[in-house]
């Protein structure tokens, strides 16, 4: 099984920590966000990872080299221009199609600035059992941006802001708003179905395909610890969470 870590962001909300380093190398409890994410993936048995980079890209490459790639096979996908989640995955898509075995296995797509105890093994198992095209970890929590699911947890739309009208692609009587956790399980055939080009959000692709009847599913993650660490105060809170053994 393979994985991709999204690590190309500028990390502007983490300044001054990101004045001299990429977001992926910001530390929580003595470990970088990149190391924490790689450790989670490695625990799942993943040995092949691709990481997209942009801001201070060479520092990530040097860091990985200094740590022997943490015993993994790691490829780097450089972005001269930030491509967002969809464009980033599409550019790196070759990595998941390079051999016949990988082309049949789902892969993990994981934001580097997300800490969680989400059971990735269980999430992959559910993805396979449901024969989903993509499975998205999501929680009931406050957020200005929400994904909308039906009673069977099929993606039906999104609300991009509190003051914006929701975008509905699959009308349903009882839509359930959930906040996305930045963790996906994706079937490789999704890569061949991405029609969007350039800079685009992967959610755009998901919604277009959901409107066609493709199975884009939610994975309930309310029972797990989760924290976005894209802001300075969130990094500080995550350090406290670590002391309280909320994650490891």
Q: Which ranges hold each PLM region?
A:
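Conserved N-terminal catalytic core of the sugar/cofactor nucleotidyltransferase
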Residues: 2-5, 27, 31-111, 122, ...
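A short, conserved acidic/glycine-rich loop-to-beta-strand motif
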Residues: 130-140
């Amino acid at each position: 099984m393979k994985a991709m870590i999204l690590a190309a962001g500028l990390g502007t909300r983490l300044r001054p920590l990101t004045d001299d380093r990429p977001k992926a190398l910001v530390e929580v409890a003595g470990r970088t966000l990149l190391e924490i994410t790689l450790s989670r993936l490695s625990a799942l048995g993943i040995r092949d990872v691709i990481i997209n980079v942009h801001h201070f890209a060479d520092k990530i490459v040097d860091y990985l080299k200094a740590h022997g790639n943490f015993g993994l096979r790691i490829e780097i996908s450089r972005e001269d221009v930030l491509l967002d989640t969809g464009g980033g995955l599409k550019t790196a898509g070759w990595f998941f199609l390079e051999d016949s075995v990988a082309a049949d296995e789902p892969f993990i797509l994981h934001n580097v600035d997300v800490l969680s105890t989400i059971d990735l093994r269980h999430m992959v198992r559910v993805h396979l059992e449901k024969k989903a095209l993509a499975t998205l970890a999501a929680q009931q929590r406050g957020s200005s941006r929400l994904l909308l699911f039906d009673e069977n947890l099929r993606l039906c739309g999104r609300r991009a802001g509190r003051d914006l009208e929701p975008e509905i692609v699959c009308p349903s009587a009882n839509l359930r708003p959930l906040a996305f956790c930045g963790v996906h399980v994706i079937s490789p055939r999704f890569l061949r179905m991405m029609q969007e080009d350039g800079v685009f959000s992967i959610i755009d692709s998901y919604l277009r395909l959901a409107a066609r009847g493709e199975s884009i599913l939610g994975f309930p993650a309310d029972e797990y610890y989760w924290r976005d660490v894209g802001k300075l105060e969130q990094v500080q809170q995550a350090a406290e969470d670590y002391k309280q053994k909320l994650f490891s």
